[in-house]
Amino acid sequence: MLQPPKIVAELSANHNQDLNLAKESLHAIKESGADFVKLQTYTPSCMTLNSKEDPFIIQGTLWDKENLYELYQKASTPLEWHAELFELARKLDLGIFSSPFSSQALELLESLNCPMYKIASFEIVDLDLIEKAARTQKPIILSSGIATHTELQDAISLCRRVNNFDITLLKCVSAYPSKIEDANLLSMVKLGEIFGVKFGLSDHTIGSLCPILATTLGASMIEKHFILNKSLQTPDSAFSMDFNGFKSMVEAIKQSVLALGEEEPRINPKTLEKRRFFARSLFVIKDIQKGEALTENNIKALRPNLGLHPKFYKEILGQKASKFLKANTPLSADDIERSL
């Protein structure tokens, strides 16, 4: 039977620089049924330069015309919050991990005993960071996003060179939000086959269709941005799923796993009881005297399933009754002179 994927709620910027909102979000994520909350661990200065020059102004995205440094100021999770959020998640029995964006971020997360690390696709070229994360011997999650085939191969090979083989590769479209027609979910499975790793989905589409479909394709992890409610205006609110949507998605994913069931064809034990009443069997429809021939006029396949299997119908035509057979009774092998 297919195992349900681990479901990760990405908090990202949806705390809106409010620690209480972040904590409230963790409570809601737990209630939604998610397995993990994921943070992003960085400071603006480890991401970019504080420059107003044109190369540092974003073009053609959800954050069009915003300055990179200022965007990361709004979106970052303050480092001083991390210990408190990790402690709260553990009290809630909610898994928690993060994406480090620098060696310093990784050191902080190690001090908090972060159980696994995700490397964002934008960081796939930072082989030094990937190696340091892999050397912790904790599970490594990579995101395809903007990464080329070669970059993914380099990152995976690096993990394996330091004897870290617990690798999950998440199919990701780095568009915010991304379109259903760009999801290309079949490639998620192919990536897993090519690189010999577990695979999953980091989803930026609107709604739960792609996560549910990815589940049916065997995804081991589903990641989706979570926001407490859609009235909040955050850098990530446009492509994040609110509490009600997330809870419904989690339930739909669980139901899809149940619906897939097992590969081995079999009759469901719960339906076997129905067979007794609704499957046909052979019945005597007119009184038959001992020694009288069985014919189309005195036996017939009818419900319920109390007599001989209808597959014997033609075989017994012309054979003789071994005793008096009363109408409206099931026909058994003992009722026929020559036993079947």
From Swiss-Prot:
Organism annotation: Helicobacter pylori (strain ATCC 700392 / 26695)
A biological process term (GO) from this entry: carbohydrate biosynthetic process
Pfam families: NeuB (PF03102), SAF (PF08666)
Keywords: Metal-binding, Transferase
Entry keyword Metal-binding: yes
Needed cofactors: a divalent metal cation
Designated name of the protein: Pseudaminic acid synthase
The UniProt record lists the keyword Signal: no
UniProt EC number: 2.5.1.97
Record PROSITE patterns: AFP_LIKE
NCBIfam families cross-referenced by the UniProt entry: PseI (TIGR03586)
Reaction equation(s) it catalyzes: 2,4-diacetamido-2,4,6-trideoxy-beta-L-altrose + phosphoenolpyruvate + H2O = pseudaminate + phosphate
Family of this protein: Belongs to the pseudaminic acid synthase family.
